[in-house]
Amino acid sequence: MTNIRKTHPLMKIVNHSLIDLPAPSNISAWWNFGSLLGLCLGIQIITGLFLAMHYTSDTLTAFSSVTHICRDVNYGWIIRYLHANGASMFFICLFLHVGRGIYYGSYTYSETWNIGILLLFAVMATAFMGYVLPWGQMSFWGATVITNLLSAIPYIGTDLVQWIWGGFSVDKATLTRFFAFHFILPFIIAALVMVHLLFLHETGSNNPTGIISDADKIPFHPYYTIKDALGFLFLLTLLLSLVLFSPDLLGDPDNYTPANPLNTPPHIKPEWYFLFAYAILRSIPNKLGGVLALVLSIAILAVMPLLHTSKQRCMMFRPISQALFWILVADLLTLTWIGGQPVEHPFIIIGQLASFLYFLLILALMPACSLIENKLLKW
């Protein structure tokens, strides 16, 4: 008799995606981050659901409802901190996943890559709106500053901002709609993940050599299920260590002060995972220019398949490109540091140089370097 997993309509889909899926035999630990992102999304949805049971999206009670979760709800503190630090883990995995895609040329699967960029935007939007919900000082002022950027759009900007706010300032209407969007977006993200995987399984996974591996495939289960399980163990160990030993390490102390529209914090800054984009935004003196640079800092990923000039797919055998890639990583770390610093000398000029280098590397230096490497191949 044929196994039920190969005949049942639903089980068949699971079987083709997770069990009998042909996978390259040589994919490294860098390919673990896809499944880790799935785990992070699952953790965020489950913890978020339990938080939503006790949270109230009203300006008068939002802050105290979060305090109530931490103090009075059974294990509320661990649910809240798993959710807050789970977001940090999510972004660590996201950045490493995108970095892997750039290094190994996975962006040549353009459909999968473009859905991935959409996912990145969706997760960033969700995280931003989630940060507003506790209604602390940084929540309120972060929401005010970032939504206000849309006023830079010519002609419709001011109307657009007031439409998003639901009034003339960030208030109850804004908080309520942000909670609604923050609740629904993870499910939209989950649907996009399915599309992401659908496109990936059309082509099959890339591998560290960048060479087509159809001749040498192994079943996903048990080889990569056990490998993913090990990744889960590492991620959960790191997350639980963070939650149980230093839950506020990545947070902002200002967010433990209830939102006050009459008192601006000395340094308004987003969560650490947005600091690189925030630094790029601040590095341009013009408001509209800054907003465009902010959007382009992520949207630039969409042009990577078009800028691929190398005859080889991945960077494994391209040492000059490797050097530029690691300069890009160092540049992003520099931008992250600058984003958390006050707007004063020498941080302003460092931020401007790092922002310029970021775009220069992706748009000019890396494609030019690939052409040079093509020439070197002929020697």
Swiss-Prot record:
Superkingdom of this protein's organism: Eukaryota
Gene Ontology cellular component terms for the protein in this record: mitochondrial inner membrane; respiratory chain complex III
Keywords tagged on the record: Electron transport, Heme, Iron, Membrane, Metal-binding, Mitochondrion, Mitochondrion inner membrane, Respiratory chain, Transmembrane, Transmembrane helix, Transport, Ubiquinone
Binding site for heme b b566: H97, H196
Cofactor: heme b
Positions annotated to bind a ubiquinone: H201
Keyword Heme included in the entry's annotation: yes
Functional description taken from the UniProt entry: Component of the ubiquinol-cytochrome c reductase complex (complex III or cytochrome b-c1 complex) that is part of the mitochondrial respiratory chain. The b-c1 complex mediates electron transfer from ubiquinol to cytochrome c. Contributes to the generation of a proton gradient across the mitochondrial membrane that is then used for ATP synthesis.
Other known facts: Heme 1 (or BL or b562) is low-potential and absorbs at about 562 nm, and heme 2 (or BH or b566) is high-potential and absorbs at about 566 nm.
Protein name as catalogued: Cytochrome b
Upper taxonomic lineage: Eukaryota, Metazoa, Chordata, Craniata, Vertebrata
Underlying gene: MT-CYB
